[in-house]
Amino acid sequence: MLIPKRVKYRKQHRPRGNGGVSKGGREVSFGEYGIQALEAGWITNRQIEAARIAMTRYIKRGGKVWIRIFPDKPITQKPAETRMGSGKGAPEHWVAVVKPGRVMFEVAGVPEATAREAMRLAMHKLPVKCKFVVRGEVGEANES
């Protein structure tokens, strides 16, 4: 499970808005094929791990998988049936903030058909709309 080893502050503010597109990480840079987000969202460390397992099980021993996102934002939650007030809740889980255009996973060392199917299985585990991208092809991830 992906979590930060240590953080400066245990709790963060929730963001006001999720506007804009990803500034960096828009191209496939390590592998040959990738999964690119088409909408903004939070992806938990469990969802990242589920997608990774789905891909590696389908690929078997063939290729290499890169995870290009990291869950570095703590999400707090108060216990059930607790009265309001008395401070902010404890950190419950970690999420990676993803904006449109961000390449989240990459694969290399397998044929395109295998990579496409492995990525399709992984996309079902993620809470945002995604698309399959190939290295070198320029594709825009605009919300339409």
From Swiss-Prot:
CDD domains reported for this sequence: Ribosomal_L16_L10e (cd01433)
Positions of the UniProt region annotated as Disordered: 1-25
Cross-referenced Gene3D superfamilies: Ribosomal protein L10e/L16 (3.90.1170.10)
Keyword field: Ribonucleoprotein, Ribosomal protein, RNA-binding, rRNA-binding, tRNA-binding
A UniProt-annotated Pfam family: Ribosomal_L16
Cellular-component GO terms for this entry: cytosolic large ribosomal subunit
Comp. bias regions, Basic residues: 1-16
GO MF terms held by the record: rRNA binding; structural constituent of ribosome; tRNA binding
UniProt-listed SUPFAM superfamilies: Ribosomal protein L16p/L10e (SSF54686)
Any one GO biological process: translation
InterPro entries the UniProt entry points to: Ribosomal_uL16, Ribosomal_uL16_bact-type, Ribosomal_uL16_CS, Ribosomal_uL16_dom, Ribosomal_uL16_sf
Family statement drawn from the similarity comment of this UniProt entry: Belongs to the universal ribosomal protein uL16 family.
Subunit structure and binding partners: Part of the 50S ribosomal subunit.
Xref: HAMAP family: Ribosomal_uL16
Entries under NCBIfam families matching the protein: rplP_bact (TIGR01164)
PANTHER family registered for this protein in UniProt: 50S/60S RIBOSOMAL PROTEIN L16, LARGE RIBOSOMAL SUBUNIT PROTEIN UL16M
Function noted in UniProt: Binds 23S rRNA and is also seen to make contacts with the A and possibly P site tRNAs.
Protein name (Swiss-Prot/TrEMBL): Large ribosomal subunit protein uL16
Annotated organism of origin: Desulforamulus reducens (strain ATCC BAA-1160 / DSM 100696 / MI-1)
